[in-house]
């Protein structure tokens, strides 16, 4: 049976399409993908992303454990702030892209992908048990996914909405900075973060879930529902729209963000014999802190010496067509890779995508062809984002 988020009943009543995604029944759209997408680019939208995973690490050894099991340096940010970091396997391949918040008092909250949290929880539990064969750890690992409702408010008007709701200016916060806030007596974690390319914030509310796998923890999500409805109520004057996963995907792709399960994963069994994707191949080296030891480091150092072989690259179509995952990519008549993500940009009305190709073609300005249902259509590799960053996105000129 598919998993359900806290507010599934609300979405079932209001969404036009609900579909299973990563094992969860989720709203895909309420009005239309294009309308919700443009609302976020031009005003503000709110997403229920409670399907995202949360894992809590507690204890004096929590930091040391996470420093070894993730790639970035999570010791630097003060409480309450987050660090974008990767979890790798021993071969250096990406198990997931995560955000780890330093919650203070030796507690760290990891935000991970919907289709990866169970795997990660099992992985961390296994590593803890393995290490404890040699030395005792002061560490507890707790799965919190079903206990936390998570909403993402995104768009140029998100700043105004945060001021109205919480009395804070998110532009005075750095990216991934968090703080505790209250709304009508309901306490929650707020972070300046998002997955759309736009300014925005995300809130985390601990609440009962009527669909919790543990029957004893089931109940009405009164706090989460109240916050969700207050966001929609206060956002009306800014043109807010509830947005589904359809718009979330087109928005992240326009911004050039990778999606775990498509662009990054441990096993990617495509017809071009792509097995696994590493941070170096996915242009994610910025999330690696080389001055420490971590799982997968040796494999990455060897890959640096040997060469990447293949790499992710962004592209836009030069002919009218829409690229999709799995479509073959050619250059000079040679098969060079496959599309990992593709869509029609609602903002630009052109086909855009990400492909995993031979390393020598993974640079801007290379003419390629995408095989779309037996016809090769012209495209060109580009540097993301796909939109004009002076007009749209986090760094737009107001």
From Swiss-Prot:
Its domain of life? Archaea
Please give the NCBIfam families that the UniProt record associates with this protein. Answer: gcvT (TIGR00528), PRK00389.1 (NF001567)
Described by its record, this protein's role is as follows:
The glycine cleavage system catalyzes the degradation of glycine.
Instruction: Return the similarity comment.
Output: Belongs to the GcvT family.
UniProt record, GO biological process: glycine decarboxylation via glycine cleavage system
Quote the InterPro entries the UniProt record gives: GCS_T, GCS_T_bac, GCST_C, GCV_T_N, GcvT/YgfZ/DmdA, GcvT/YgfZ_C, TrmE/GcvT_dom1
* Keyword vocabulary terms for this entry: Aminotransferase, Transferase
How it assembles, according to the record, is:
The glycine cleavage system is composed of four proteins: P, T, L and H.
| Any one GO cellular component localisation term in the record | glycine cleavage complex
The enzyme's first-digit EC class, named in words, is transferase
- Reactions that this protein is recorded to catalyse: N(6)-[(R)-S(8)-aminomethyldihydrolipoyl]-L-lysyl-[protein] + (6S)-5,6,7,8-tetrahydrofolate = N(6)-[(R)-dihydrolipoyl]-L-lysyl-[protein] + (6R)-5,10-methylene-5,6,7,8-tetrahydrofolate + NH4(+)
Give the enzyme's EC designation. Answer: 2.1.2.10
Report the protein name in the record. Answer: Probable aminomethyltransferase
- One MF term in GO for this entry? aminomethyltransferase activity
